[in-house]
Design a protein with these regions (language model features):
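Surface-exposed peri-terminal alpha-helical interaction modules
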Residues: 2-283
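Short, C-terminally biased terminal segments at protein or domain edges
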Residues: 283-292
Length: 292
């Protein structure tokens, strides 16, 4: 449980650090950070394209850190024998809302790409780079409990995967396999299923209703519900953005040559929702209908 009222200053990880010389530009490594944006053309839109994706990658990085904390806290709460369903979840619910806010950052940042007018100026120059290759997003999805739906997502009409996918597999295939093994029984979807199994009731709706009235389970499910909606919105927006951008350049494949229609649509067809019954239950209870 967070003890914000009793925290004490921590010493620097580097005991030789002279904190009097730790200025804003050095602490945030601004020069190194800004040097990471390196457009390949003189297009006035390419620097924006890079910046938006780098902002999202920074958000993903922090989301991964906080998701690890959420999963650890949930695992400990599940193992707490003081409650037959789940113990104190305040630690998990301290970090979970931060993940949700960061996901909102991603969802409000990506639409800026719609302001580009000259995607065609640099699209071919950036080569096989593709959002498909975001290993951090894959890491986050695996921690969420998503299966390997993206496998083969770039295959052409002959069934051959694009270089964007083959190179991604070569570079990060072993990491992906390790993440699937590590989070097999340690992910959001797994803990959701565990809570359902422990909850009284003969139907999923009855089980969810009981959990939403449980003092420790309820805030977790509310965070999960929001996370699921954000995940679905991200995939829906990504698909819509890809369609819009490719209309500008008059082609049918995404950056890197990926078959975006099949790949981006697979999540909704094969994975969503992450927490079956949760969003629908909320809609039914509130009488709002599913608006996602």
């Amino acid at each position: 449980m967070p003890q914000s009222d009793h925290t004490q200053p921590l010493p620097p990880l580097d005991p030789t650090l002279d904190v009097t010389q730790n200025h804003y530009w050095t602490y945030h490594n601004l020069e190194a950070l800004l040097s990471c944006k390196r457009p390949l053309t003189a297009s006035q839109d390419e620097d924006l394209f890079i910046a938006v994706h780098q902002i999202c990658e920074l958000a993903f990085h922090q989301m991964i850190l906080d998701m690890e904390r959420v999963l650890t806290a949930l695992g400990e709460a599940i193992a707490d024998n003081t409650d037959p369903i789940i113990g104190d979840t305040s630690e998990a619910c301290y970090f979970f809302p931060r993940i949700l806010r960061l996901y909102e950052v991603v969802l409000t940042t990506m639409p800026i790409l719609k302001t580009m007018r000259a995607f065609a100026e640099f699209r071919t120059t950036i080569g096989p780079t593709s959002g498909f290759q975001s290993f951090q997003f894959r890491h986050l999805e695996i921690m969420s409990g998503v299966r390997n739906y993206w496998q083969g997502g770039t295959k052409d009409t002959q069934g051959n995967p694009h270089i964007a996918e083959t190179e991604f597999d070569r570079r990060y295939g072993s990491d992906i396999a390790q993440w699937f093994e590590r989070y097999h029984n340690h992910n959001l979807a797994y803990y959701y299923d565990t809570l359902l199994q422990r909850s009284p009731g003969n139907t999923t709706a009855e089980q969810i209703s009981a959990l939403l009235n449980h003092p420790h389970a309820s805030p977790v499910l509310q965070n999960m519900r929001t996370y699921d909606n954000l995940q679905i919105r991200f995939h829906q927006f990504h698909l819509a953005l890809a369609v819009q951008q490719l209309k500008l350049v008059g082609v049918e494949v995404g950056t890197g040559g990926t078959s975006f229609r099949n790949y981006l649509a697979k999540y909704h067809k094969q994975q969503a929702p992450l927490f079956p019954g949760l969003t629908q239950f909320d809609d039914r209870e509130q009488g709002t209908g599913n608006k996602e």
